[in-house]
Regions:
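Phosphate-binding glycine-rich loops and adjacent basic patches that engage nucleotide phosphates
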Residues: 8-18, 42, 59-63, 82-85
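Hydrophobic pocket/interface hotspot
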Residues: 9-12, 24-25, 32, 44, ...
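Short, low-complexity N-terminal intrinsically disordered segments enriched in polar/charged residues
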Residues: 1-30, 127-131
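Helix N-cap and loop-to-helix transition residues
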Residues: 4, 20, 43-44, 116
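A solvent-exposed, acidic/Ser-Thr-rich amphipathic alpha-helical stretch
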Residues: 21-75
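A beta-strand edge to alpha-helix "cap/lid" segment located at domain peripheries
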Residues: 4, 53-131
Length: 131
């Protein structure tokens, strides 16, 4: 039986909380893209890994909280607070994302995330994430 979008989302959030980059990346393939709108998307495994890797590596804890969600066919709309703990300090960012899935393969194919990256980068500059 085909996997449901909500099951992919829950498994993906679990992988993030385990901070296991191989497990996180197993949800994507070469067709996948993740866009922090309005910035250009990260396309394919390598680019998406480059996006996730620094923050996952720096964080001692990761927790993405879903505030509200809607599911239809192969899509999910997720209002979230993405929370990262770096050197004992919590950094959180509010996001609204549209996720599209390849249900037979259980993959995340596209993400369009709407987030104020300016504010996020300002906060993270304090954590020296770009070292």
């Amino acid at each position: 039986s085909m996997v449901k979008p909500v099951e992919i989302v829950e498994s993906f959030l679990q992988a993030l909380s385990e901070r296991e980059i191989g497990l996180i990346m197993s949800f994507f393939d070469e067709r996948s893209s993740w866009q922090n709108v309005p910035h250009p998307p990260s396309n394919g495994i390598q680019e998406i890994e480059l996006m996730f890797s620094p923050i996952i590596r720096k964080s001692s804890k990761v927790q993405w909280d879903i505030l509200s969600s809607a599911y239809a066919e192969n899509r999910a709309w997720l209002e979230r607070v993405d929370r990262f703990w770096i050197a004992g300090i919590e950094y959180s960012v509010q996001c609204n994302g549209v996720f599209e899935f390849d249900l037979p393969r259980g993959k995340i194919i596209t993400v369009r995330d709407y987030v104020d990256l300016g504010e996020w980068r300002e906060r993270l500059a304090l954590a020296q994430l770009n070292d």
